[in-house]
Amino acid sequence: MPEISLANLSMILGAMALAKGVYFITAAKKASEMVKAFPRNDNAGYLLILISMVWFLLILKGENMADFEWARTLFNVFILATGIGSCLYLKDYLAVRGAAVLMMLIAKLIVDTARFHESEWRLVLVTVAYLMVIGGMWFTVSPWRMRDLFAWGTADEKRFKILCGVRIGFGILLLMLGLFEFK
Protein backbone atom coordinates (compact mmCIF):
# COMPACT_ATOMS: atom_id res chain seq x y z
CA MET A 1 0.00 0.00 0.00
CA PRO A 2 1.23 3.51 -0.72
CA GLU A 3 2.32 5.35 2.38
CA ILE A 4 0.42 8.38 3.58
CA SER A 5 1.37 10.82 6.30
CA LEU A 6 -0.76 11.07 9.42
CA ALA A 7 -1.38 14.74 8.59
CA ASN A 8 -2.75 13.89 5.15
CA LEU A 9 -4.80 10.97 6.45
CA SER A 10 -6.27 13.14 9.20
CA MET A 11 -7.15 15.89 6.72
CA ILE A 12 -8.73 13.42 4.27
CA LEU A 13 -10.83 11.76 6.98
CA GLY A 14 -11.70 15.17 8.44
CA ALA A 15 -12.74 16.58 5.07
CA MET A 16 -14.88 13.51 4.38
CA ALA A 17 -16.58 13.73 7.79
CA LEU A 18 -17.10 17.48 7.41
CA ALA A 19 -18.49 17.22 3.87
CA LYS A 20 -20.83 14.38 4.80
CA GLY A 21 -22.01 16.20 7.92
CA VAL A 22 -22.65 19.46 6.07
CA TYR A 23 -24.50 17.68 3.26
CA PHE A 24 -26.57 15.66 5.70
CA ILE A 25 -27.50 18.69 7.79
CA THR A 26 -28.43 20.84 4.77
CA ALA A 27 -30.45 18.09 3.07
CA ALA A 28 -31.66 16.41 6.25
CA LYS A 29 -34.85 14.88 4.84
CA LYS A 30 -33.19 13.35 1.77
CA ALA A 31 -30.10 12.31 3.72
CA SER A 32 -32.23 10.68 6.40
CA GLU A 33 -33.98 8.59 3.76
CA MET A 34 -30.62 7.61 2.23
CA VAL A 35 -29.30 6.54 5.63
CA LYS A 36 -32.41 4.47 6.34
CA ALA A 37 -32.19 2.75 2.94
CA PHE A 38 -28.44 2.03 3.12
CA PRO A 39 -28.43 -1.32 5.02
CA ARG A 40 -30.44 -3.07 2.30
CA ASN A 41 -28.93 -1.26 -0.70
CA ASP A 42 -27.51 -4.05 -2.86
CA ASN A 43 -25.65 -1.71 -5.23
CA ALA A 44 -23.82 -0.06 -2.32
CA GLY A 45 -23.08 -3.54 -1.00
CA TYR A 46 -21.55 -4.71 -4.28
CA LEU A 47 -19.40 -1.57 -4.47
CA LEU A 48 -18.22 -1.78 -0.84
CA ILE A 49 -17.43 -5.50 -1.13
CA LEU A 50 -15.49 -4.86 -4.36
CA ILE A 51 -13.50 -1.99 -2.80
CA SER A 52 -12.78 -4.06 0.30
CA MET A 53 -11.75 -7.10 -1.71
CA VAL A 54 -9.34 -5.12 -3.91
CA TRP A 55 -7.90 -3.30 -0.90
CA PHE A 56 -7.39 -6.59 0.96
CA LEU A 57 -5.66 -8.10 -2.09
CA LEU A 58 -3.34 -5.06 -2.26
CA ILE A 59 -2.49 -5.45 1.43
CA LEU A 60 -1.78 -9.15 0.93
CA LYS A 61 0.38 -8.41 -2.12
CA GLY A 62 2.66 -6.20 -0.03
CA GLU A 63 2.94 -8.55 2.94
CA ASN A 64 5.94 -10.77 3.63
CA MET A 65 4.33 -14.15 4.20
CA ALA A 66 7.57 -16.00 5.08
CA ASP A 67 6.60 -19.63 5.75
CA PHE A 68 3.25 -19.23 3.99
CA GLU A 69 4.57 -17.80 0.72
CA TRP A 70 3.61 -21.04 -1.01
CA ALA A 71 -0.04 -20.34 -0.10
CA ARG A 72 -0.22 -16.76 -1.44
CA THR A 73 -2.23 -17.82 -4.50
CA LEU A 74 -4.59 -19.83 -2.29
CA PHE A 75 -5.15 -16.77 -0.08
CA ASN A 76 -5.89 -14.65 -3.15
CA VAL A 77 -8.38 -17.22 -4.43
CA PHE A 78 -9.97 -17.44 -0.98
CA ILE A 79 -10.37 -13.65 -0.78
CA LEU A 80 -11.92 -13.51 -4.26
CA ALA A 81 -14.23 -16.46 -3.50
CA THR A 82 -15.30 -14.88 -0.21
CA GLY A 83 -16.06 -11.53 -1.85
CA ILE A 84 -17.91 -13.01 -4.80
CA GLY A 85 -19.67 -15.56 -2.60
CA SER A 86 -20.83 -12.80 -0.28
CA CYS A 87 -22.34 -10.92 -3.22
CA LEU A 88 -24.09 -14.05 -4.49
CA TYR A 89 -25.24 -15.74 -1.29
CA LEU A 90 -25.28 -13.12 1.49
CA LYS A 91 -27.42 -10.44 -0.11
CA ASP A 92 -29.24 -9.74 3.13
CA TYR A 93 -27.60 -6.59 4.54
CA LEU A 94 -24.77 -6.81 2.00
CA ALA A 95 -24.09 -3.06 2.27
CA VAL A 96 -23.65 -3.39 6.03
CA ARG A 97 -21.25 -6.29 5.64
CA GLY A 98 -19.26 -4.40 2.99
CA ALA A 99 -19.16 -1.29 5.17
CA ALA A 100 -18.03 -3.38 8.15
CA VAL A 101 -15.09 -4.86 6.23
CA LEU A 102 -14.18 -1.42 4.89
CA MET A 103 -14.31 0.02 8.43
CA MET A 104 -11.77 -2.56 9.57
CA LEU A 105 -9.49 -1.87 6.59
CA ILE A 106 -9.62 1.88 7.23
CA ALA A 107 -8.85 1.18 10.89
CA LYS A 108 -5.77 -0.82 9.83
CA LEU A 109 -4.60 2.11 7.70
CA ILE A 110 -5.11 4.53 10.61
CA VAL A 111 -3.24 2.38 13.14
CA ASP A 112 -0.39 1.63 10.71
CA THR A 113 -0.06 5.33 9.87
CA ALA A 114 -0.26 6.57 13.46
CA ARG A 115 1.99 3.89 14.95
CA PHE A 116 5.27 5.80 14.96
CA HIS A 117 4.00 9.39 15.15
CA GLU A 118 5.26 11.28 18.18
CA SER A 119 2.19 13.39 19.00
CA GLU A 120 -0.12 12.14 21.72
CA TRP A 121 -3.00 13.49 19.62
CA ARG A 122 -2.54 10.45 17.37
CA LEU A 123 -4.53 8.58 20.02
CA VAL A 124 -7.67 10.40 18.84
CA LEU A 125 -7.38 8.61 15.51
CA VAL A 126 -6.19 5.35 17.07
CA THR A 127 -9.20 5.34 19.42
CA VAL A 128 -11.51 5.89 16.46
CA ALA A 129 -9.73 3.05 14.64
CA TYR A 130 -10.30 0.64 17.50
CA LEU A 131 -13.96 1.69 17.72
CA MET A 132 -14.20 1.02 13.98
CA VAL A 133 -12.77 -2.47 14.44
CA ILE A 134 -15.24 -3.23 17.23
CA GLY A 135 -18.09 -1.80 15.14
CA GLY A 136 -16.92 -3.69 12.07
CA MET A 137 -16.89 -7.01 13.92
CA TRP A 138 -20.23 -6.26 15.56
CA PHE A 139 -21.92 -5.29 12.29
CA THR A 140 -20.42 -8.30 10.49
CA VAL A 141 -22.01 -10.81 12.86
CA SER A 142 -25.23 -8.86 13.47
CA PRO A 143 -25.80 -6.51 10.52
CA TRP A 144 -29.37 -5.66 11.57
CA ARG A 145 -27.80 -3.65 14.41
CA MET A 146 -26.68 -1.02 11.89
CA ARG A 147 -30.23 -0.81 10.57
CA ASP A 148 -31.47 -0.37 14.14
CA LEU A 149 -28.80 2.23 14.89
CA PHE A 150 -29.66 4.16 11.72
CA ALA A 151 -33.38 3.92 12.53
CA TRP A 152 -32.69 5.40 15.97
CA GLY A 153 -30.52 8.18 14.51
CA THR A 154 -33.08 9.15 11.89
CA ALA A 155 -36.25 8.73 13.97
CA ASP A 156 -36.21 12.38 15.01
CA GLU A 157 -35.04 15.22 12.75
CA LYS A 158 -33.56 17.12 15.69
CA ARG A 159 -31.56 14.04 16.77
CA PHE A 160 -30.37 13.53 13.18
CA LYS A 161 -29.17 17.13 12.96
CA ILE A 162 -27.40 16.86 16.32
CA LEU A 163 -25.59 13.74 15.10
CA CYS A 164 -24.66 15.60 11.90
CA GLY A 165 -23.33 18.46 14.04
CA VAL A 166 -21.19 16.01 16.00
CA ARG A 167 -19.85 14.65 12.68
CA ILE A 168 -19.07 18.21 11.54
CA GLY A 169 -17.28 18.95 14.82
CA PHE A 170 -15.24 15.77 14.55
CA GLY A 171 -14.37 16.57 10.94
CA ILE A 172 -13.14 20.02 11.98
CA LEU A 173 -11.06 18.45 14.78
CA LEU A 174 -9.41 16.04 12.34
CA LEU A 175 -8.73 18.84 9.87
CA MET A 176 -7.15 20.97 12.59
CA LEU A 177 -5.03 18.06 13.81
CA GLY A 178 -3.88 17.39 10.26
CA LEU A 179 -3.05 21.02 9.60
CA PHE A 180 -1.41 22.00 12.88
CA GLU A 181 -0.47 18.98 15.01
CA PHE A 182 0.55 16.13 12.71
CA LYS A 183 3.01 18.10 10.52
Regions found by a protein language model. Give the residues of each.
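Juxtamembrane boundary at the C-terminal end of a transmembrane helix
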Residues: 173-183
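Alpha-helical transmembrane segments of polytopic membrane proteins
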Residues: 7-11, 42-48, 72-80, 160-164
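N-terminal topogenic module of multi-pass integral membrane proteins
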Residues: 1-54
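Short, proline-centered helix/strand-breaking motifs
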Residues: 26-30, 140-146
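Interfacial loop-to-transmembrane junctions
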Residues: 147-166
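Hydrophobic alpha-helical transmembrane segments of multipass integral membrane proteins
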Residues: 11-22, 50-57, 77-81, 104-111, ...
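Membrane-proximal helix-loop-helix units in multi-pass membrane proteins
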Residues: 68-136, 147
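Short juxtamembrane and helix-loop transition motifs at transmembrane-helix boundaries
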Residues: 29-40, 55-67, 83-94, 149-154
